[in-house]
A protein has these predicted regions:
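C-terminal cap/linker of serine protease catalytic domains
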Residues: 83, 134, 138-191, 242, ...
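Conserved PDZ fold ligand-binding element
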Residues: 14-22, 139, 205-227
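Flexible, gly/ser-rich surface segments that form the specificity/activation loops bordering the active-site cleft
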Residues: 67-114, 147-153, 165-178
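Conserved active-site neighborhood of the chymotrypsin/trypsin-like protease fold
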Residues: 3-8, 12-93, 115-116, 125, ...
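Gly/Ser-enriched beta-turn/beta-hairpin loop segments
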Residues: 46-53, 102-117, 172-180, 186-193
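Active-site-proximal beta-strands of protease catalytic cores
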Residues: 18-21, 74-87, 127-148, 167, ...
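PDZ-domain C-terminal substructure recognizer with occasional recognition of PDZ-binding tails
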Residues: 42, 169-173, 177, 195, ...
């Protein structure tokens, strides 16, 4: 789905660490980084956080100058922002706009944020672009272009990296953070509810018998009418737990029990 070769951009957040969008390196057998000086840095390790959507690339080689970070709590609607990106390693592009809203966001790959940055900035280059405020402080990483649905770009707030920074730098998950159930499906919300539009081949939902076109009615007895309802109910469970999905399939209502997996383990 993501392709055999992917290109993106990132931003230095430490002398030997670059932050980018996680799907750019997800499942990659090798990752290469070319810095602004044209010199390649070897990637020693890529720390991927599926919950936030960030990847932190740990580099060897000459140090980079890290960008100063700023929490997004002071980003009101209308605040000016700009991004920096490129389409290849020999160019740099910029674009500016304004914050539309900082608010909830849900996506079909079992992904949900309580606070995402929606902006009017049109990204003229690759994903993973750093988003800055008017003072040049890093406030987010541009993950998606959403012009097809009336929004130009979405950025993951840097606040989430600050919360997970110690874990991503050390590679050790905090014992205080619960594991989330993952079933490997692609649900889409519409006026009548939530439907399964695809499955991860070999994932828990695929193995359990959920099928494309199933209309999801409830999760463990909790009715779901939106992606937020669905993920909130699903994430009450953890890997190894059984999750009961009540579905409408053609004209029949049935319950499909799925043994939840761990997304991080699946994509290692």
């Amino acid at each position: 789905v993501l392709g055999d070769e992917r290109m993106g951009v990132g931003v230095a957040v430490a002398p030997r660490a670059v932050l980018t969008a996680h799907y750019l390196v997800l499942g990659a057998s090798s990752v290469h980084v070319a810095a602004f000086d044209g010199r390649e840095r070897a990637v020693r390790e890529a720390a991927v956080d599926h919950e936030t959507g960030f990847a932190l690339l740990h580099l060897d080689g000459p140090e980079l100058r890290p960008s100063p970070l700023a929490p997004t709590g002071r980003l009101p609607a209308g605040a000016p922002v700009f991004l920096l990106t490129c389409q290849d390693e020999n160019e740099r592009k910029g674009a500016s706009g304004h914050v539309m809203v900082v608010g909830p966001f849900e996506a079909f790959w079992e992904y949900m944020l309580d606070q995402a940055i929606m902006t009017t900035v049109v990204n003229p280059g690759l994903a993973g672009a750093p988003l800055f405020d008017a003072q040049g402080l890093l406030v987010g990483i541009v993950s998606l272009g959403l012009s097809a649905v009336g929004r130009y770009s979405l950025a993951i707030p840097i606040d989430l990296f600050l919360e997970r920074r110690e874990e991503m730098e050390s590679g050790a998950r905090s014992p205080d953070r619960p594991f989330r159930a993952w079933v490997g499906f692609y649900p889409q919300a519409f006026d009548g509810g939530v439907a399964v539009t695809g499955l991860v081949s070999g994932g828990p939902a695929d193995k359990a018998g959920l099928t494309r076109g199933d209309l999801l009615l409830s999760v463990d007895g909790t009715a779901v009418g939106s992606l937020r309802d669905l993920y909130t109910a699903l994430w009450r469970k953890g890997p190894g737990d059984t999750v009961g999905f009540q579905v409408l399939r053609e004209s029949a209502i049935l319950v499909v029990e799925v043994i939840a997996g761990d997304r991080e383990d699946f994509y290692k």
